[in-house]
Amino acid sequence: MLTGSIVALVTPMDKTGEIDFLTLKQLVEFHIKSGTAAIVAVGTSGESATLDVDTHAKVVIKALEFADGRIPIIAGNGANSTSEAVLLSKRFADSGIIAGLNVTPYYNKPTQEGLFQHFKAIAESCDLPQILYNVPGRTSVDMLPETVARLSKIKNIIGIKEATGDLNRLADIKALVADDFALYSGDDATGCDFLLQGGHGVISVTTNIAPVEMAKMCEYALSGQADLAKKIDNQLAPVHKYLFIESNPIPVKWACAEMGLLPSADCRLPLMMLDKKYQPIVRNALIEAKLIS
């Protein structure tokens, strides 16, 4: 089972919205050298919603090519259309991608049975292992623990990224699934506690800018060294908070640019660059977290 700090990687872009593949390569190298356990390419932080299917697939495959077997790549392959999610999964099957990360369908708000049938169809479409992704704050639909438990019995569904930030939800899911079902936090602010309470990893926005610190925090938490894990988590608390002062990935792309990790903080419309009134707040968070001076 994959454990530890998994980066929800930003997708570098220029001012016209074109993908900056040179910087993407540099980011992959950065995470390999920093001890990140795996990379999620083109998830929420990678602006999956504004990339067409071909561009989406190209970014994932390029990340895989740049990794060259040195770090596992997980493909963001969720969509609010089951057929599109199936199409992406089939593209990534047999590519070397270790799993697909599938968000609950957004906007169309399916029922729990609709969620079950959606993820079942994706899992049965090809041999690519699938990780569920529940983030009701962005999708307006909450996949309940009982639905997760049903899905966990399907062969190719190997885990969940749970981003409610509710630690009771972790306990509820953990009680219903097998021990080999991977439980990943999708909420940096509660990620440390999630691991200390039995989770296996964090799929993290903060890891974009603090990969070494997040890797150590996860290592300590997973080995039961709570005091050491909490010390790092407390250090990073300002960025856990203020990387969400506007919609993700707007603040983290700005922070990456501020730290010299991206040449540009540009996003694709309808996302904009971080509002100027928030830039000093994010900069101060980086200083408080000892990521810049």
From Swiss-Prot:
Pathway assigned to this chain's UniProt record: Amino-acid biosynthesis; L-lysine biosynthesis via DAP pathway; (S)-tetrahydrodipicolinate from L-aspartate: step 3/4
Compartments (UniProt record): Cytoplasm
Sample GO molecular function, one term: 4-hydroxy-tetrahydrodipicolinate synthase activity
Keywords per UniProt: Amino-acid biosynthesis, Cytoplasm, Diaminopimelate biosynthesis, Lyase, Lysine biosynthesis, Schiff base
Annotated catalysed reactions: L-aspartate 4-semialdehyde + pyruvate = (2S,4S)-4-hydroxy-2,3,4,5-tetrahydrodipicolinate + H2O + H(+)
SMART domains to which the protein is assigned, alphabetical: DHDPS
CDD domains: DHDPS
Leading EC class: lyase
Gene Ontology process terms (BP): diaminopimelate biosynthetic process; lysine biosynthetic process via diaminopimelate
Binding residue positions for pyruvate: 45, 203
PROSITE patterns according to UniProt: DHDPS_2 (PS00666)
Family according to the record: Belongs to the DapA family.
Function, as annotated: Catalyzes the condensation of (S)-aspartate-beta-semialdehyde [(S)-ASA] and pyruvate to 4-hydroxy-tetrahydrodipicolinate (HTPA).
Entries under NCBIfam families matching the protein: dapA (TIGR00674)
UniProt name for this protein: 4-hydroxy-tetrahydrodipicolinate synthase
Organism: Psychromonas ingrahamii (strain DSM 17664 / CCUG 51855 / 37)
